[in-house]
Amino acid sequence: MVDELVLLLHALLMRHRALSIENSQLMEQLRLLVCERASLLRQVRPPSCPVPFPETFNGESSRLPEFIVQTASYMLVNENRFCNDAMKVAFLISLLTGEAEEWVVPYIEMDSPILGDYRAFLDEMKQCFGWDDDEDDDDEEEDDY
């Protein structure tokens, strides 16, 4: 019985050694594949965006329509990056400077619900920076993004 156990233990140790060698070989193959993948990814360039990155907005009322069109267009062609209203609002905020940036600070400090509502955020911007209501009706499609 002891001899049988010794033989069984020896067989198990041999199998363990063979599996360890196979595991090492597989790990090396995996390492090579990961390196090859990284090399291939470096060679592939992402497609260029057909819409340029929007300009910043400093609160100048006459530039608000242009700013909204630019940001809406950019978000539309990059919709995978702007999957919800909070992401869209955060993007707009990242482009605010000067008076417009100062305007948004209180909303951020009080964690206003408007920061998660793209349409409401645009409405607040329009109200603060002087957007004519007649233009609002004409440009409603641009706001929907």
UniProtKB/Swiss-Prot annotation:
Keywords: Nucleus. This is Protein LDOC1. It comes from the Eukaryota. One of its GO terms (biological process) is cellular response to lipopolysaccharide. May have an important role in the development and/or progression of some cancers. GO terms for cellular component: nucleus. The keyword Nucleus applies. It is found in: Nucleus. Interacts with NOD2. Pfam families: DUF4939. Its main location: nucleus. Belongs to the LDOC1 family.
